[in-house]
């Protein structure tokens, strides 16, 4: 999966998790609050993965560009 998709899915999971937590809070459902917290954390992780992929690609592009200039 590409970095953009990781970021989009991460944001979606974050928002869904926050919504679940809010509903759990409003209804007194500890189960729903817990599920929401887990889903939100998953979203943070997915976004971090997308950012890491971008950083690796940027570094690889810079290295390739520098190597090409030295040829």
UniProtKB/Swiss-Prot annotation:
Lineage of the organism: Bacteria, Pseudomonadati, Pseudomonadota, Alphaproteobacteria, Hyphomicrobiales
Name of the protein in its database record: UPF0337 protein RPA4418
Signal peptide bounds: none
Organism: Rhodopseudomonas palustris (strain ATCC BAA-98 / CGA009)
Protein family membership: Belongs to the UPF0337 (CsbD) family.
Family matches, as InterPro entries: CsbD, YjbJ_sf
Pfam families: CsbD
Region described as Disordered: 1-54
